Amino acid sequence: MGDLLSDEARRAALVELPGWREADGGKAFTRTFTFRNFNEAFGFMTRAALVAEKNDHHPDWRNVYKTVEVNLSTHDAGGITARDVALAKKMNEIAARFGI
């Protein structure tokens, strides 16, 4: 599960997570990724899904054509933990491969 991050730790994490912001009153991180087309968006989701499954930590996300909206929160902990920060970083790395 993991321990909830403090307000200070959440703010510090966001500095290292370009494109992400707090949502749900500080209980989640969110980002919308916009790709060139559906194939890239789906490719991103496929790669991110493999990482999520490997780490047994899954995003709440939604895909419409070339956009992917992601919300990260550790539901068992009731907010943001280091697991969410790690997955957000990995998602940014994957998106960078697509020029995002």
UniProtKB/Swiss-Prot annotation:
EC number: 4.2.1.96
Superkingdom per UniProt: Bacteria
One GO MF term: 4-alpha-hydroxytetrahydrobiopterin dehydratase activity
Record InterPro entries: PCD_sf (IPR036428), Pterin_deHydtase (IPR001533)
GO biological process, one term: tetrahydrobiopterin biosynthetic process
TM helices/strands, residue ranges: none
Pfam families listed in its UniProt record: Pterin_4a
Catalytic activity: (4aS,6R)-4a-hydroxy-L-erythro-5,6,7,8-tetrahydrobiopterin = (6R)-L-erythro-6,7-dihydrobiopterin + H2O
Keywords for the protein's UniProt record, in alphabetical order: Lyase
Enzyme class: lyase
Keyword Mitochondrion: no
Family membership noted in the UniProt record: Belongs to the pterin-4-alpha-carbinolamine dehydratase family.
NCBIfam families reported in the protein's UniProt record: PRK00823.1-2 (NF002017), PRK00823.1-3 (NF002018)
Protein name per the record: Putative pterin-4-alpha-carbinolamine dehydratase
Organism taxonomic ancestry: Bacteria, Pseudomonadati, Pseudomonadota, Alphaproteobacteria, Hyphomicrobiales
